[in-house]
Amino acid sequence: MIRRIAVIGAGNMARVRSKALLATGQATICGIASRTLASARRFGVEIGCDACYDRYEPLLDTSPDAVLIEIPHQPQDAATFWALEHGLHVLVGGCLASTSQAARQIADVAQAKGLVVEAGYASRYGALWRRVRRLIQDCEMGRLVAVRSIALWAGDPTTWYYDQALSGGMPLTHMTYGYINLLRWILGDPVCVSAMGNRVHHTQVGLVEQETCLANLVFPGDVVANMMASFVKPGDLDGWSVLFLGTEGMAKVDGDHNTLEIDRQGQQETLDYAGSVDPFALQAQAFIAAFEGQDTCLNTPTDCLEDVRVAEAIARSCKSLETVWL
């Protein structure tokens, strides 16, 4: 069965995810809505969709089964509730919601209506992170002791990502990707967080309150994690990595080059995942399969609600300079 997917948003990630959905061979894009009609039409030409609008409400006229939402987090909430109200499955391009309150409501509505809602963290589907998860959970490096992560991204202060109100803040927009969502999937939900942040590079009124953040978290099993994330990334500096320290070895994820280095008591190997199946394609397949009741989605509302809660705790700790218990 070919599923009809409507798209809200016409930016780069809307294109990436729409093409991944089309590549499944089980979906068609039936309508596109963007604040700017010209943007929707340009996108429509690229993927062969004529039904383009400057509001998302008319998308109902295209008889969609589901909607892909790729817009700033603040208006994303209203679009998600609208889609659920009209009985549509939802693939949200980023975090589940802009606040934990909205995320909890989305989880409740989706469960009550029996609808699929998938948050946008595609990395959980990738071969690299599936291998890391097995590595840690099977204790291949002994007992895990600590984690250190770096996530740097050269943010553009003229875009919504840098806008505190539209984005919900850097911990929500950026740190849930690097690497709260993945660490939660592997280690479980953190117990507490202590964080500090600053705003040095771009300091105009209304921009994100934490441009750079250092967060220390305690995960189940007394695993400690240090996470550095920033919208500052000068030049060609590598910006994505995670180090896992175990009692009998260590592993390092190089997110810039999609490799995994493993050291087990001096026995070293490097695994290259550059040619592995695109996680966006795997997520698209899982999303569509879930329409038939299959338990294929890895970023469900009840799970990804916790990403939002952790991001809020990080922001709260940055402001209070106190440990926040979750």
Q: Which role fits each region the language model picked out?
A:
Residues M1, A27, P58, A66-I69, ...:
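C-terminal helix-rich "cap/oligomerization" subdomain common to oxidoreductases
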Residues M1-I47:
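N-terminal Rossmann-like dinucleotide-binding module
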Residues A38, I47-V109:
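Beta-loop-alpha module in the N-terminal Rossmann-like domain of NAD(P)-dependent dehydrogenases
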Residues V92, V117-A119, M227, V253:
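Hydrophobic residues in well-ordered beta-strands that form the structural core
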Residues Q105-S123, G142-S149:
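Rossmann-fold dehydrogenase core element
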Residues S123-L207, L321:
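Predominantly a Rossmann-like dinucleotide-binding segment in NAD(P)-dependent oxidoreductases
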Residues H174, I180-H257, A281-D295:
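Contiguous beta-strand/loop segments that form the cofactor/metal-binding neighborhood of enzyme cores
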Residues A274-Q285, T302:
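Active-site loop of classical SDR/Rossmann-like NAD(P)-dependent oxidoreductases
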